[in-house]
């Protein structure tokens, strides 16, 4: 059997299993095992039956709807390649729309950026890499309450200035020392309505804690909007991702705080409503009761 024939059979198996991107996935899995990229697969000569056995096993796992990214162990996101796997939400291409918006904004020379619900560190690490590519600096804080997600985030943030904080964004008066200090806040929080029907890759493999946002999908979004109102300085910028059914609800929520101007609904790369942006205005909120971080909110700087 040739590699081309093996890929053809794999693509047919994946299509029969309901995988939308069957051919693409079959090629990516082959490239992963070959240690090359898809474009160079025609140049690859499989060393023997052992390769085809491994390929059969990994394709069978994909046919069981194990996410492609779990099998490969990485996912591309903007300018970075992130480590992902069981226990952490796999970043989606849709979220790159927030990244594109954020990188187009005018920020101070060394801004303070917060990524709330950072998960694998996707937005935080991508923003850090973007600024590094331009020779620019920033202080970037990623926040999440999942130990497993933060393990991946630490690995992804290695060699960057990203700081990671273990904390629940729904905690009242979280991190009061950030009040009125943040220049840019982005968030891809859990936002899927609880009753939504999901693809097997999502329902069976992504952590539910990172997916579902309450009956209407707005529970964590509401908490994040509250934090943005506190943490952003006047003129600070905010972007939050939402379900494609809750764009109007998110716009109404942000607008109802009376703390933001230029509230805009925005679409993802596929043209679906996906995130809302706004600018903070008005007086700074009162400082928190104390400036200390709760010891449960452990902070760590990624190893260089």
UniProtKB/Swiss-Prot annotation:
It catalyses: L-glutaminyl-[peptide chain release factor] + S-adenosyl-L-methionine = N(5)-methyl-L-glutaminyl-[peptide chain release factor] + S-adenosyl-L-homocysteine + H(+). Methylates the class 1 translation termination release factors RF1/PrfA and RF2/PrfB on the glutamine residue of the universally conserved GGQ motif. The lineage of its organism: Bacteria, Bacillati, Actinomycetota, Actinomycetes, Mycobacteriales. The gene is prmC. Belongs to the protein N5-glutamine methyltransferase family. PrmC subfamily. It comes from Mycobacterium tuberculosis (strain ATCC 25618 / H37Rv). Its EC number is 2.1.1.297. S-adenosyl-L-methionine binds at residues 144, 188. This is Release factor glutamine methyltransferase. It is an enzyme of class 2 (transferase). The keyword Phosphoprotein does not apply.
């Amino acid at each position: 059997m040739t590699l081309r024939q093996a890929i053809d059979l794999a693509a047919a198996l994946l299509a029969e299993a309901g995988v939308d991107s069957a051919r693409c996935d079959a090629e990516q899995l082959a490239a992963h095992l070959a240690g090359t990229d898809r474009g160079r697969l025609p140049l690859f000569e499989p060393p023997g039956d052992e390769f085809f056995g491994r390929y059969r096993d990994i394709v069978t796992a994909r046919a069981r709807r194990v996410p492609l990214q779990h099998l490969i162990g990485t996912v591309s996101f903007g300018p970075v390649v992130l480590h992902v796997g069981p226990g952490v939400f796999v970043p989606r291409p849709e979220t790159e729309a927030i990244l594109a918006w954020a990188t187009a904004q005018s920020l101070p020379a060394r801004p303070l950026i917060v990524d709330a619900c950072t998960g694998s560190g996707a937005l935080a690490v991508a923003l850090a890499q973007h600024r590094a590519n331009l020779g620019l600096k920033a202080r970037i804080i990623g926040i999440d309450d999942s130990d497993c997600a933060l393990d991946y985030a630490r690995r992804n943030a290695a060699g960057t200035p990203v700081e990671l904080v273990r904390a629940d964004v729904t905690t009242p008066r979280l991190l009061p020392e950030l009040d009125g200090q943040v220049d840019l806040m982005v968030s891809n929080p859990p936002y899927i309505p609880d009753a939504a029907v999901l693809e097997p890759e999502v329902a069976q493999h992504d952590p539910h804690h990172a997916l579902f946002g309450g009956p209407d999908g707005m529970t964590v979004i509401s908490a994040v909007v509250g934090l943005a109102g506190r943490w952003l300085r006047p003129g600070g910028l905010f972007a939050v991702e939402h379900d494609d059914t809750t764009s109007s609800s998110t716009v109404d929520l942000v607008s109802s705080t009376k703390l933001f101007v230029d509230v805009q609904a925005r679409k993802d790369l596929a043209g679906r409503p996906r995130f809302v942006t706004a600018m903070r205005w008005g007086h700074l909120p009162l400082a928190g009761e104390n400036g200390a971080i709760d010891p449960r909110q452990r902070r760590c700087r990624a190893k260089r």
